[in-house]
């Protein structure tokens, strides 16, 4: 993997097209004078935005990649907990598999940081 990447003809935050040099995963220079790069490519005037952040998710409860299931939990917190436990058993939800599926999709769509909550309970062992 290259330590530096020169992205030519890109529009940071929708502004005027320019060049951006990335070094060690961070922006090192912006402007037509940005040079160098172990690798480079022309972005064709595309938009450059910061990576997306998912600040609150429950990766272990994802149905991503599975069929559609109606949400049947009641309004109380205990209703939601019991429904989630029942769904886990009934639909054979594997937290590792489902978490991986959802993370892969998030990264594909531009997410660079994820903060997740997970269950630790007697049903999981």
What kind of region is each of these model predictions?
Residues 4, 50-52, 115:
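Hydrophobic "anchor" residues on beta-strands that sit immediately upstream
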